Amino acid sequence: MQHQLVVKRLGRQDYEPVWKAMHEFTDQRTDDTPDEVWLVEHNPVFTQGQAGKAEHLINTGDIPVVQSDRGGQVTYHGPGQLVAYFLINLRRKKLGVRDLVTHIENLVINTLKAYNIDSAARPDAPGVYVDGKKICSLGLRIRKGCSFHGLALNVNMDLGPFLRINPCGYEGMEMVQVSQVGGPEDIEAVEKQLIQELVTLLDYEQVEFSTEAPSQGNKA
């Protein structure tokens, strides 16, 4: 099972049912459960991480705010943004939390490099940046030695809602997206590249693709 990965493409979903399904999957998984990555686009939502502060919500308007249990501060999810949730048994992979964060950042950096986009991580603010502008946000939670939550990569979306918050708690943080810096507009092309990089980085040998929604996710 250590080298087996199931990739689920969930399409467009509300945030909360997928969040609940992640919890269920993590609570019910055993040492024999293969790792999974869920790829999803969310309907518009602001999510507050565990460190989130109300003052970073400037003007949320008609977009709902959900209190999440991932690490980090407030961010925005919406159509045209690739969200990848990493349901990985870290003990089995012999990875620490910091290792996983570094792997995920490198995964995004390598994905962008395939489109000749130079990007970098920052030691003071998790995520991936292009010319100082944030292109990918990151927030994880670990339970029973297993990770859930993951990354949000801006591909081809309306970035306007980010102006209604201090993204990840940083006032004036500028956001950018793949389609603005010479990359593709097609989110599926970016998904494909991301999974290719993940399989290489984390040494998966068997990859199974599925569009079957998780137990909670199909209620969205």
UniProtKB/Swiss-Prot annotation:
Q: Identify the pathway.
A: Protein modification; protein lipoylation via endogenous pathway; protein N(6)-(lipoyl)lysine from octanoyl-[acyl-carrier-protein]: step 1/2
Q: Name the encoding gene, please.
A: lipB
Task: Answer yes or no on keyword Signal.
Answer: no
Family indicated by similarity = Belongs to the LipB family.
A single GO CC term for this protein reads: cytoplasm
In this protein, which residues make up the domain named BPL/LPL catalytic? 31-206
What is any one GO biological process for this UniProt entry? protein modification process
Q: What class of enzyme is it?
A: transferase
Write down the species: Vibrio campbellii (strain ATCC BAA-1116)
Miscellaneous comment in the UniProt entry for this protein: In the reaction, the free carboxyl group of octanoic acid is attached via an amide linkage to the epsilon-amino group of a specific lysine residue of lipoyl domains of lipoate-dependent enzymes.
Q: What is this protein called?
A: Octanoyltransferase
Keyword annotations of the record = Acyltransferase, Cytoplasm, Transferase
Fetch the NCBIfam families from UniProt: lipB, PRK14342.1
Q: Which cell locations does it reside in?
A: Cytoplasm
Q: Where does substrate bind?
A: R70, G71, G72, Q73, V74, T75, Y76, H77, S137, L138, G139, G150, L151, A152
